[in-house]
């Protein structure tokens, strides 16, 4: 018989187990312990708080379960069951726990916490019991009992760490909610959250932990949201300790404060209400790295999608924006990077960012400027309307950045925007309109000197503007409407691009031709020169030279490669063929073992430039069809934003340009039939372009297309006789180019036109004169003689020497082309006819050139009024002066005529650049530059630019300086690339312009008193205008060479007047001023020039080493010139001296903004300057060229105001003695001179003469009005050889041989003849 075991006593009370449960001791097995504990768990689970009897009964058992045996039992099942029992005990006995010892309570809760780790494995058979444990603890809030314990924090930290560590993605929502309830009750119901407890939560927000356990991160997020109000002060205290007080030791998370702030802000911005002011404090830290960290943080806070921090905390936002101007580069860089996200997520903040991005777009750091572009473009790609026009303007500016990386990013970014919104039409019409300017801007960049820029524009054009991979019809439609919508400068750039590509193709073609020739020294030299030319058309020409040589070597060794390259550059190569050839050649050159192959990259650059990827016969045919649709009215012109007329005109212009570069592609019946249809259209421009296309492409029409020939001939005859002047010119050239019986064809035009000339009907004269001039130039052998009688009897006697109509007396110096009188238009063409006739003959056997030059000189002397009847208007006189000056310059381009142009005639021509009319100066300077830059004019004509120092308009002076820079660089480059003889060197070396300039300035009509300091200042300004550009670099000891030039001049005499002491004194004085400038501006050098300069004998006598050694300017004058204050008057005029032409408007040196907006003053790029014709001169109203409006200069001389309604009448003050002033008239600097001249000077002037002597006007020598007044003038004021007075003109004989000069004034017979010209400065 078994007796029951005596119950064990706990606290003097016996332990009572539930029915059926035996005593649990350490004597039994673990399995038995587990079995008995499960029954105990069941008992406690079924009990509730109201069972007072049972609570008392099982109290000893509850105490027993907290014994060491259970709490430290090694069996996890035992521990789990005990934990469940203890949890139920806390539930049953709540709110008081049966355990009174704090140590015991702590031990129990740490034990329970350890058991919660079992929640980790959801597939465990015991998981439900673990879940019950968690649920029980959370529901009862059992852990709140620990608040009474002194070291409860240890329990809570352990609990939080346990729960965050066990949660995983296999847990359901209930598990997460119970964990959350458990932790939030502890957080919210306690007296506060300790730092360690806070750390146990925040650590789950750090990236490393977040990536390891996303569920822990989510749990922490929800916990912080739920307990935000309670936990916020603790968070604020933590960040205050770390950020403000710098106590990083308070937490292991101190180094992650900025990451934590970002995460907390994303969870709930209210958690950081007290932290944000601390960040503002940190933004102003002295530590750059610290500011950078804060900026990175705030960039994320402000830029996040749903953030309203910028509106909620304006002080912090403004402080953050201030970091865009931080002294620390990484901080500025980070600020700029942030802007992209901000623009995309918060468009309303774009206005705040714009000004700061503007400043950063000019940041000295390249990386920052680059990132500004990336920022704006990235936002614009997402949605164009996220960025305003001002931001896009910053990108536009950076296309001209000094750094290639920045320029490239800006250009590519804009190109991508254009393709997205204009080509693909994303964003609709509004978006396309917003970026429609991009195509023009990108093409304008082709004007830049950098080869990298040019190549990128070509790449952008081929890939973004007109993608070459489109089908032919689509590609040509894209090109057709692009060309029609480009601005004029962009069109010129695109034309230049095709021209450059075509030129490079021809260079490569010539290189291949050299490979076909037998090897020789001459062949090797020619090949090397060609390789250098090709290399200059590739990036980094220095390295490219080596690669081009290597490629040439490969070409020489690989015949198949040569044949493929020949196919690529052949005129008949199609676009598809070109793609295949480029791929094949690149594959052959590539080296598989070399991933980055600079040689291959260079070859690709070359192939991309020469490959015809856009235009072939099929493409031309597609373009013609598009144009036909526009003519028929069935095209999509209006939808593309182009009017049908504009589309047709642009289409013809496009075809015209392509006819130069791809003439073979035009040769088809269909194309020429369409062009014939265009010829019959009423639009003059369209017909003119069509004729030009026939001229460029029709060489095989006569043999291959007889029907086209039959239809074309009568049209060309009609255009040559009755078309517009431009059509007539093109028609004559077209006949001359494409027909074998051109002599017969031209005769059929020449004879009726020459017989029908009638000066009484000037409206019908212009076209015949154009046709006759070009016929005589193209076929001089046939028409030179019959033209001579036309010139003598009609052109000179009947047309030029008679005024049949009265001009408009409105006093303006210029008028629009459409307002020019027909008679003056005819006279202008008559002058051009004379020049073309002479250029055709290319000889002066009949002395017709001398007569013509005298006629042109007389035109300049008479200010354009050759008859001196005063019937012609001022604006018409300006036109004729320009025509005469341009004609002399044109003749000078032909060596046989250059030799007979006298120094006096050259000086008259030069003075046109100082004409009183703005447009005359402008157009003449453009023509001068165009001829010089092509090396067609002798070097002495470059000296004319020195006179531009006297131009009153700043932009004209700037343009002249650019012209000088361009000309000098071209000449120096030519000398480097082409070995030249010493004789040829005289006409090319830029430094040789110095003697011509000195001679020209010595004969300046304004230079009358060699010792007058004001006149010397003028001379010094002109000299420095040229010398500054020449002396930029001391290449090849050029400074010493120029000094030697000046010294040599002082050993000669003025060949124009060798026995005139006054003329020689002026020459030596100018020479001394030049030496003064050279000595002052050159770097100190003791070496002498190794070369002995040769002086042109046309202007200087043979050197006499003992002739002149004295100085012609005093030391005082020299000091004043070098260090004196600027003159108180403008260069072009003398203040307080009345004009000698009634009502003539005085000049004043002014800035561009002070000139009427009707005057074109913008200095243009070389490309546009070279193409600008006189017909493009803008219309002007009240402007520099009006006689009456006066420009007043106020006391501060830097500012001027235009007084439009004030008139000056000089009839009473200017005596009629203009004929006595030999040399050009010169405009007064300004009215209102009392604001500039000193009062003492005015009184002195008044005392000298009641009627001051009028100052000659810049531009031309004035005509004589009376012999009597001429006699009263001081002889010293007369420059020699300026053309005779009109009174002497009647003394000329009019023999048959000199019929062309019947009424043309000749040079004064008393003038000294110049020495035989010894040096050919042109050939």
From Swiss-Prot:
HEAT repeats mapped onto the chain: 385-421
Subunit structure and binding partners: Interacts with the cohesin complex. Binds chromatin in a cohesin-dependent manner.
Compartment(s): Nucleus
Other notes: Chromosomes assembled in the absence of pds5a and aprin/pds5b proteins have a mild defect in centromere cohesion in vitro.
UniProt organism field: Xenopus laevis
GO biological process, one term: negative regulation of DNA replication
Keyword Transcription: no
Comp. bias regions, Basic and acidic residues: 1235-1246
GO CC terms in record: chromatin; nucleus
UniProt name for this protein: Sister chromatid cohesion protein PDS5 homolog A-A
Cited function: May regulate sister chromatid cohesion during mitosis and couple it to DNA replication.
Comp. bias regions, Low complexity: 1153-1165
UniProt entry keywords in alphabetical sequence: Cell cycle, Cell division, Mitosis, Nucleus, Repeat
InterPro entries xrefs: ARM-like, ARM-type_fold, Pds5
Polar residues bias spans: 1166-1176, 1210-1220
Coiled-coil residue windows: none
